[in-house]
Amino acid sequence: MAFLGHLVLGKVMAEECPLSAPLVLKDMQSGVAGETGNVWTIAPDCSFTVARQVGLNLLQPHKQGQLTLQQRLQLEQMMDRMAATALPEQLGSGPQVNARRITLAYGGKQSVLTLPPGGGDLGALRAAASDDSTRHMLDLANDLKAMMGGG
C-alpha cells in the first residue's frame, strides 16, 4: 500500500510545474521601429504563449498551449541548471547599433545577451561563443524555443 502511495505521490509531483513565477525568453532585434522579435512565456501552471513584440507592443499570442509531462521534466532540469550556474545580468558585447538581444527573466532576475545585428541561428552562435556563460544562455534559449515552438 505504501508503494502505491509513493507511485501516486511521484506522479503528482512529476505533473506539477517547476516554476514559481513566469519564465520569459525574448529574442529581439533593434532597428528603426525600436525592438522587434518574439517573446516566449511559461506561466507557473506550465501553460505557455509565443507572441510577437513590435516596439513596446506585445501582440496577441500566435501560439499557446500546455507543456507535456516530458517537457515539464525537461523544464525542471533546465531550472536546476539555471540555479547551479548563475548567469550575469549582462553578457556579450557592449551597446551596438541595431543589436540583437536575448533576454531570459525569471523570479525577479534577468540576464541579457547582446549580439551583433542579425546574429543567426542559436546553435551557430553557441559554437562561436567565447565563454561558458554565453554558451549556457544560448543553450537555455535554444531549449526553451524548441520546447514551445519557434517564433
Task: For the regions a language model picked out, list residue spans one by one.
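Extracytoplasmic/periplasmic, Sec-exported soluble proteins
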Residues: G34, K63-Q70, A129-D132, H136
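A short, structured loop/turn motif at beta-sheet edges
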Residues: P44-D45, Q66-L75, L104-S111
